[in-house]
Amino acid sequence: PGQSRTVRFVLGWYFPVPDRVSLGFLRGSDTLRRQYGGRFADARAVVEHVAGDLDRLEADTRAWVKTWYTDATLPHWFLERTLAPASTLATNTCYLFDDGRFYGWEGVYCCPGTCEHVWNYAQSIARLFPQLERDTRSRVDLGIGFHADTGQIGNRAEADMAWATDGQCGTILRCYREHLTAPDDTYLRANWSRLRRALEWVMDHDAGPNGTLDGAQPNTLDTVWYGEIAWITGMYVAALRAGAEMADEMGQSEFADRCRALAESGSRDLST
């Protein structure tokens, strides 16, 4: 009685098998496991790992906080807004499966498919774990969700193979981003033929052609818009410019010139 002591404890959990009902539409869902299931045998093993490496884990965490906040010269409101979305990775919105596939809902258990028209606006993962984004572009957007006959990308891959205009333009931009963060041009060369076809699919919806999109434009607001829409046309123009840069690197100058001409036309339209 009257004494006190400090006790450290770790709250650990281990649920390597995801909910296969809600994820039943995913390819191979009947055997998918969380990636950490291959690293640890049970919750005790997780706790023992934390306990055995606690000093380093704490030191790395403190170093991150010091680097990002204490030593930063940027305003804190900017730092908060930049990093806060990364916390989503630690929720049940996101999964990393044992086959290496990254998957994300729009929100926890809501709206499937790592959907383009939501996730193309996210930036945190690409900067923190660029290899995950490169794999998702190749495996999902230009793989599982890709219509090889047309170039259309299924907005939600297996869950919905229809397209979203802002989503497909955004995915082309993401592919360029993934190339820019890659150590060499291997990623671009492996994906270029499908990436070009995906851009050509969007260009097919430019009836002019004049650098602006026409007809139905399904988008992230869960609706379909028509006509010249500055926001979506702006994404189309950006995708054209990204496509031109990649085409140049691939030695396809004629296609690059075509993309730039449309982008210039679209930019003029946006400014008037």
Give residue ranges: language-model regions:
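Substrate-binding groove/exosite segments of carbohydrate-active enzymes
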Residues: 3, 7-8, 14, 34-206, ...
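Beta-rich accessory regions
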Residues: 1-6, 19, 265-270
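Beta-strand segments within the central parallel beta-sheet cores of soluble alpha/beta enzyme folds
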Residues: 189-196, 215, 254-267
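Alpha-helical scaffold segments in carbohydrate-active enzymes
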Residues: 194-205, 235, 242-245, 262-270
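Aromatic- and carboxylate-enriched substrate-binding clefts and catalytic-loop regions
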Residues: 159-160, 217-221, 225-234, 258-272
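Short, Lys/Arg- and Gly-enriched loop/turn segments at beta-strand edges
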Residues: 13-23
